[in-house]
């Protein structure tokens, strides 16, 4: 079929509309420039020889520099095909080859046309993805060349748009630009795979025994739950108490063969609507906290219950803080002991933080951060802080668990600038073990010195997220004018410092060491307890847990205090420290914890200060077992090249051993010693009865006790699981006199229960809160007293004609009689925590 002749096509070829437009416009078109315009940094370089004196011209796979016929830059393959279109002598009909022949022929598309009309100066076309940015980056893979940019404004697009180059050091530059996603990384979850305490282990051989699985994973830490019901389907779920144990198991067992199958391990993200049992993910929310209380003071208070991972603040709510523990058991202990206690004159409230808060708030936090007006270096989140089932705080994600993508280009610029591409001091960048891909070899030894010997022209930036890092590397960067380690986190001088004259205490650098010669910026200490100079300081060794608060010795006073006897120090008002005391932050008066009877016993109270501060002759100083030979700043030298992943794991195992010993010692103080009781050396009276069958009611249990011990006790409490409407497996009883404990112990301890054919064996231990008065004080202000009367604690007359009979329980001066009835069912929380209602069986001393 013949087509009409196109007046603008002399050869009878079907010309695309865009070409017709150009022909109709002729040379007078305002959109056609007879001379090729120079190209800016976004669209390429018109004159590559501009950089010929400093860098060889690097060919780009999509740049053909000039078309000899037109003298016009050809930027991609589409333009090359259009060149063939104009020079084709055969006069083919391109109508049926339309998708192979691009039609814009160097004319801008519609967006470019409109952009050219409204703005004749700025180049048209805005890149909107990392892939397009890479096309225009001539130096992105050649020599690590970085253009001069402002270190603060270089993160205008937000940390979510940061790309860290993969490969060797110096082999990439960061790209910034609008991104169509918020920091998405490779992984099976929307925001990547977040470290959590629960591991989803796939590719499991169904013949593997549960004990074999437990022994394999238990070497990395105590296992909270082991779910193997789906083992026949090829996967199991393993949950740890400590998130560090989960991360260690992930790294140590990923792709390891088990019964000829390689394990495929992933982190399991907590449910959006968790059960009460899953609610505790190691993070507590502190409400009604006085804004004058610093993070260091909070760390000191809560650090007595376990190692603090980090403390986060909410920008708009200064009286709220989030405190995250490594171990969920520490969070439970702190929740039970400190909830509704008074700190700095205010009664605080503690609640467990619900999982999923980070995912829900990540986009909102990132957007909120970007919109702020203050310099962006003041909002840089801590790189090493993983997103781990905890609320507000936005973290950038820099690597995928499945990609070998270390932070290799962070400080690898050949220009010698110690600042990272996102304007972040290296001293605040986490170590290799926390940022290395999960399940891969870290290969960090090649890059470790990048963070150890760097010039740092900028001081440390303030962070809303105060993370206490793991001790994974023996050395971190430090230079005059940069607050690092304890200086930045605790506001104290370096407890363990070294001088340049003693290089033996650090492994030799690979190649030639780069001395630190940066001038001091003159920052002061943040609420330091003692003045210290920042001038001339060199690299330091951190012998506390870098990433957790220093255990037992956070400041200059490296002593803990251990009560020699369990006396009434349970209710002492404890003043924290003298030299590095808690109160030295703002007014130097010392922070008083007015917890009265709610204060808890701590086997090694991490309270820095003098023994006289506690006014107790039974306190004696002990050395922290974690400090070892490094107690006075002299670490154990491990030889050249001894840093890296292997030694970090070994140190982690050593810490776990220390922690196990510490926990064993902690449990000993709750064990009953009948000999001491007979001699009168141990005067405690409150006992915890463990391993009670869940179907037992208060009436049943009291009937068993009253058979031989009626009138020997004055307090009884059987906690109830309100969800399942049964007891939680333990109870508390206060004996009138310690002498009654011996017979009670002989009657119950190690004996099986008569009812329900239970296999459980009763066990006795001391409770944490001791004495009738302390128990009443603990419960009378609890929200439990507002719930069902049948689940409340019970008081008994201890003398007189009514001895052994119930007496009213005082609640805020009002006596309420509590009749004892069978089938105790309640809907409240026995310890005043409205959220955590599902109480599990716990070890001795953890509940009261």
From Swiss-Prot:
This is Protein MEI2-like 2. GO terms for molecular function: RNA binding. It comes from Oryza sativa subsp. japonica (Rice). It comes from the Eukaryota. InterPro entries: MEI2-like_RRM1, MEI2-like_RRM3, Mei2-like_Rrm_C, Nucleotide-bd_a/b_plait_sf, RBD_domain_sf, RRM_dom. Residues 370-400, 455-523, 826-848 are annotated as: Disordered. The keyword Calcium does not apply. PROSITE patterns: RRM. One of its GO terms (biological process) is positive regulation of meiotic nuclear division. Keywords: Repeat, RNA-binding. Disulfide bonds: none annotated. The gene is ML2. The keyword Nucleotide-binding does not apply. Residues 197-270, 282-355 form the RRM domain. It holds the Pfam family RRM_1.
